[in-house]
Amino acid sequence: MKAAVVGIAGPALLPEEAALFRAFPPAGVILFGRNIAEPAQLARLMADLRAVLPAHAVFMVDQEGGRVARLRPPYWRAHPRARTLGHLFDSNPRAGLRIAWLTGALIGADCAEAGFTVTAAPVLDLSVPDAHDVIGDRALAEDPVVIARLARAVAAGIGAAGIQPVGKHAPGHGRARVDSHLSLPRVETNDLAADIRPFALNSDLPWMMTAHIVFPALDPILPVTLSPRAIGGTIRGHIGFKGVLVTDDLAMKALDGRPADLAQQAIAAGCDIALYCSGELAPTEAVLRQVPVVSPAGAERLATARAGAARRRLSMNPALLAAEREWLGA
């Protein structure tokens, strides 16, 4: 199984994609709006993917709530943006945490019903007023401790539905003044304590995602995704994260180079999984040919994440989630 999670082109699995996945099995797939039209179509696509992917393949979706949502009305619920949860916490911390958990549980329930196993949420980045709005209202708060508490509640709700949450974008995207989808941010500060704290306080999450950002305080040249120093010293070291580490999308313009080379470099730097989302067949094939197989340590982390999700789902009282969904008018 190759150390990559990849996208596909459209709402149906192409014969060329199926053949590629049989020849070079990826660790999983990630689906976007272009792949999701309505529930029956998605069910067919999921069945076709399961038929060609490894038994424990990851089915990932970027379902944060707010403006980042791939499962959308009218077939799936709309969920509040992260900033709304922060405002609720400011008014009433206990209620804010409860609604954060419920939001996570409902996001998780939607993902589980659709056949996904992992969602790229919650966002652990700081809200920084003068930064680029690529994070913006996706951030829970300005206070790192409030972020940590709300993110833990969201992640716990997601986990209660049997879905594996992903904390992102380690070690923090909030200060970036440019959009890493378009160019490479460089954050010139020697004090990253506030940025790192929400990640450190949630270091037991099953997954984290790296940031495509250069922090000269961590590595003067390489973005975190490609930096052994930033990954080993900060994410694995200072933050203390021991779970599955996945890159942000290697198709983003923050990174220069062939996606296949970037994937190989990210794995060599210490990431467990390279994420390549474009859905374009030729570069996806190049990534899957070139990236190594999942390492023994990565395989163990993936297995631990799966087992944790199964335990949380089995311990969740289905009647409780159903009652709370009814209470919310979902």
Where are these regions (language model features)?
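N-terminal small/glycine-rich loop or linker at the start of catalytic domains
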Residues: 1-3, 64-90, 126-136, 165-186, ...
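Preference for extracellular/luminal or secreted protein segments
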Residues: 1-24, 257-330
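N-terminal hydrophobic targeting/anchoring segments and the immediately downstream early-domain regions
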Residues: 1-59, 65-75, 330
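Hydrophobic faces of well-ordered beta-strands that scaffold small-molecule active sites
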Residues: 2-8, 27-31, 57-63, 118-122, ...
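Active-site mouth loops of central-metabolism enzymes
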Residues: 3-15, 82-102, 181-193, 251-257
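Second-shell residues forming the walls of enzyme active-site clefts
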Residues: 34-52, 149-300, 304
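Glycine-rich anion/phosphate-binding loops
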Residues: 37-43, 89-109, 142-150, 191-193
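Glycine-rich, aromatic-flanked loop segments that form ligand/cofactor-binding clefts
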Residues: 52-80, 100-127, 147, 155-171
